Amino acid sequence: MIKAVLFDFDETLQDRTEAFEDYMDTFFSDFCPDISSDEIERRKQDMRITGNGGYVNREEWYATLIESWQWKNAPSSKELALHYDTKFGDHNVIFPDSARLLEELKNRGYLVGIITNGPSILQHHKLDTSGLRKYCDIVVVSGDIDIHKPDPAIFTYTADKLGLKAEECVYVGDHPVNDIQGSLAAGMKPIRMNYGWFKDQDLRNDVPVIESIIDVLNIVK
């Protein structure tokens, strides 16, 4: 019997792709206020490509940006990291049905939670500005416990905290490895959100696929 429905955050409840587009406007306003609009667009494309949808070694990413661009006053990697961690959450773009979905699951008697990879400051800021934390019985951020998806331990840790077995949990996420393989290995029942950087990649016949987050309600009755 399913007792909990758990979610990834980025590209599952939050439209990270659109949030990143909004964040880049603040980034260039703060760090490159004097460059032309054409140069901003060129550098935005650099950030999209080298940022790899957020699946990147951030120190290497920042070093690439610093070294490959001309700067009037070049920031340090530490400054770029602090800016990203403290500003990105101000640009949350939550899928329109995310709050309604979580509220409906709560009304149906399910426990609801989020398991997300990322630095603690960044992810908690995003969660705080998302408006979704109030629906959650548990929030697990990998940076808080030093366990990262796809390690099955982060999924079993969450189930244990809820007083449940992994088999009693559904997990919804977009990443074919971090979310789907990880939750399967832990014993959870995954649902694939087919969106974002990994859309249409490595879909599995044994895992339900949804195109919109509200479609979870068609699977979890």
Regions found by a protein language model. Give the residues of each.
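Asp-based, Mg2+/Mn2+-dependent phosphohydrolase catalytic module
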Residues: 1-5, 18, 33, 99, ...
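N-terminal helical cap/lid subdomain that shapes the substrate entry/recognition surface
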Residues: 2-96
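Residue-level marker of alpha-helix boundaries and capping positions
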Residues: 53, 92, 114, 170-171
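Short beta-strand/loop segments at the ligand-binding rim of alpha/beta enzyme cores
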Residues: 110-112
